Every structure is written in structure tokens, then in C-alpha cells.
Amino acid sequence: MHAERLLFMTGTALENKVEEMISLIRILQPRIASQIQGMVFMSAAPQFRKAVAPVYYRRKREDVLTELPDLIESKEWCSLSHNEELAYEHAVLSKNYAEARRVSWNVDDLRDSSKASRLLELVEEAESEDRKVIVFSFFLDTIRKVTMLLGKRCTNPINGAVTPQRRQEIIDEFDKAPAGTVLVAQIQSGGTGLNIQSASVVVLCEPQFKPSIENQAISRAYRMGQTRNVLVYRLLCEDTVDEKIMSTLESKQAIFDAFADKSVAAAESQEIDDRTFGNIIKEEIDRINAKYGNTK
């Protein structure tokens, strides 16, 4: 197919690494792509910004949607109960990465879950303020447990097995539901391509490995048509992988923000890869072993 003009429009020109953006530019302007091919380190950011200026123009949401209400984000730090701590330490020492990430949700009885307790409080607060809630998690088992915990407050959950048509039906039901109603969604499925402005509270059950995944999930509620301030709560547990994941992501996000606001891609990945998370688990193993006097 031939065309006189070619335009790419995306909210995520770069998600993991600078080469992704170079690949897009190569289609638009091969000459510019060849110039920036080697500019993949932070020291080259100024040159990169200047080189891509003819083909890359970034407009942030707040630049064009000045009427949007405030977005208020909060970290909800929870202290582990004894049973939570035992379950978490078992997951870490057995190098069960998924279970370690599901800290607080991986207990048998959610009455022992500090995150579940805080979630219930947030839902009650939302109802008292005439708000509705979206709860996101990466894990299907967490989705199942949250749905059981909240019972009749929930609509049907959204996950990868739900068809696009059925997803929209669930959202339509949620839009008509009273304050205090909760939509529970798997973040990969419900976090993109959906408009859920009837909710003004977003709860993230665990930190994700990519900031872009969380940002897109939040944007289901915080988008054109939203009339209320949107409250975002991140449920986190102290002295766990939650702390280390957040610390790592925040440092990467700061680098990205410093450059992306000037229409330049940060030359470092924002994503926590398997190797990085493996190092986080190793640090936790060492900490737990030291706690019990095991130096092996």
C-alpha cells in the first residue's frame, strides 16, 4: 500500500527500551533512525532529543485536557501479620516469585491479610463519599479472592477469558450500579481500551513491573469525561518485595520523566526484568536468613 503521508499516534512510543522508538522512527524517517541508532545511553539524551525533533512531538494529557480534575495518588503501607509474614517468607525462601509478589493475598484466610483489611476500609470510604471503585491485580487468584471478599459489592470480574463484548456489558452494569460498587479486573485485560469514568477510586493490589501498565490502568477512570478527583491507592507491604519494586520503579520513572517531558525517550528501560527481580528475591533471602541467624 502506498501513501503520501504517514503518521503514527501512540501514548507509548517507548515502553521498555529506546530501540522500540527507533524502530518506529525507522519507518517514518530511515535517515534519522540511522543517526540515532547508537544513542542508547543517558549521556546521549540531548543529542537524541535534537535528532528526533523533526519526527517526534509529545503532548501530555494535562497539556490538552486542562479541564480534568485532580489525580491524587497514595501509597498505603501495610504491616504484615504473623501469618502473612510466615507465608511471605516461605514464598521467598522457596524462590516462588509469583507467591512473593502476591504478598498478603497469598494467605489462606483473608482475615489475616493486611491488604484485604485496608481494601475493605477504602471501599467503605468510597461508598460514604458516593464513589465507585476499580480494583486491579495482575494475578487471577488475587482477583478471585478479592471478588469473594467483597461479595455483593462486586460486579462480575474482568479477566483475559472475558470477551470484549461481555467486558463492555460488565462496564455498562457497573456504570448503572450505586455508590460503593466495585469492579475487579485483571490489569492486563481491564487496564487498556476501556472507559470507566463512573469510577473515581482506583486500587492497585500490588506494584507492577512496568509503570506504563499502572498508568494505563489508572487512565481507565482518569480520562476525558471524568468529573471528580480520581483517588489512586497502591496497596503495599513493608519489608517485602513491594518496597524494593517500588524503589526500583521510582528511580526509573524519575529518569524517564526528566527526558520524556522534553519529547525525548529515556535511554534506560522502565521495566523490572526477571534478572532484576531475581536480585530482589536474593536480597530478601539474605535478609530473612539473617533474621533467623542462618548465615548459609
Predicted feature residues:
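Conserved P-loop NTPase motor "coupling/switch" region that bridges the ATPase
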Residues: 1-67, 179, 226-229
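Interdomain linker/hinge connecting the two RecA-like lobes of the SF2 helicase core
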Residues: 34, 40-131, 140-141, 148, ...
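Short beta-strand segments
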Residues: 52, 56, 77-79, 134-139, ...
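Conserved helicase ATPase core of P-loop NTP-dependent helicases/translocases
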Residues: 134-136, 145, 152-190
